[in-house]
Swiss-Prot record:
Keyword Mitochondrion assigned: yes
Predominant place of localization: mitochondrion
InterPro entries linked: NADH_DH_suC (IPR010218), NADH_quin_OxRdtase_su_C/D-like (IPR037232), NADH_UbQ_OxRdtase_30kDa_su (IPR001268), NADH_UbQ_OxRdtase_CS (IPR020396)
UniProt similarity note: Belongs to the complex I 30 kDa subunit family.
Pfam family, any one: Complex1_30kDa
GO molecular function terms listed in the Swiss-Prot or TrEMBL record: NADH dehydrogenase (ubiquinone) activity
Keywords in alphabetical order: Membrane, Mitochondrion, Mitochondrion inner membrane, NAD, Oxidoreductase, Transit peptide, Translocase, Transport, Ubiquinone, Virulence
Function comment: Core subunit of the mitochondrial membrane respiratory chain NADH dehydrogenase (Complex I) which catalyzes electron transfer from NADH through the respiratory chain, using ubiquinone as an electron acceptor. Plays a role in cell wall integrity and is involved in osmotic and oxidative resistance, yeast to hypha transition and the ability to damage and invade oral epithelial cells.
Name of the top EC class for this enzyme: translocase
Compartments reported by the entry: Mitochondrion inner membrane
Disulfide bridge map: none
Protein name: NADH dehydrogenase [ubiquinone] iron-sulfur protein 3, mitochondrial
Biased composition (Basic and acidic residues): 270-279
Amino acid sequence: MISRTLLKRSLPTVQFLRPFTRSSIRRSAHEEDLVNLNELPRQKSLEENYVPLINPTEKYKVQIEELHKFGTYIMACLPKYVQQFSVWKDELTIYVAPSAILPTMLFLKNNTACQFKQVSDVTAADYPSRTNRFDVVYNLLSVRHNSRIRVKTYANETTPVPSITPLFNGANWFERETYDLFGVFFEGHPDLRRILTDYGFEGHPLRKDFPTTGYTEVRYDEEKKRIIYEPLELTQAWRNFTVGSSVWEPVGEGKDFTPESFKLPTPEPEPEKESDEKK
C-alpha cells in the first residue's frame, strides 16, 4: 500500500517534467539553425541608397521628340481641323473645334499610322469663368501601335457637340455619363438620357456651380412605404463668411503674433466738417 501511494504522488511530477525536457531538447536542436545577427551584412549608408531626382523632360526625352513629330504629322494631314497640339511627358493632346470632331476621329481611327480604334473614356471639365465653360475630352487607344492620344474640344450649356457613337459604339454610355454629370449635349446620339442619377434629377452634379448638398433630399418614408423626395432642409441657416472671418466663435482677448514692423498704423480720425448753417 505504501509503495502504491508513493507511486501516485510521483506521477504528477513526471507529467510536468516530460514536456519540459522535450522542449529543451527541441530548443537545443534548433539552435544550430539560428542565424547570428552579428554576422549579417550591414545596411547601406544613406548616400548609397540616395537616388537623384530626374527631370521629367530628360526621362521622357525620346518619347517627347517622337510625339512632337507625330503631332506635327497630324496637323499636316488635318490643317483645316486641328488647331494645335501639346505634349506633356508621354501624353499627346490635340485641340479641335466641335465641328471638327467627326472628321478628326475618322482620321485617327482609319489612318494607318494612327489606328486608334478604341475609346477608353469620354469626359469633360468645367471652367465657369470661360465663355465655353466645358472642355470635352476624348481618350483613344491604339492596340496595334500600343499608344494613346487625347482629343479636346469645347462647348457650353447650349452648344451641342457631335456624337462619335456612329464611329465608336463604346462611346454610347460615355457620352450619356458626360451629359448626365456635366450637361453637355451630344448631337446625333441615339439615346441621350441620364445614366447615373435618378429619374427627374435636377441639375448636373459635376458642374462647379452645383451645390454640394443638392436640391432635394431622398429618404424612405415609413408611412408611405416608398422612397420620397423632399425639399432640402439644412439644420443651420446659410451664412456668408467674408474674407478674414472665422467660423468659430472667438473666446478671450486673443493674441496677435504679427511683428510690429508688419502692422499697419492706426489711421487718425478725420476732422468733422462744419455744416453750412454754422458758416
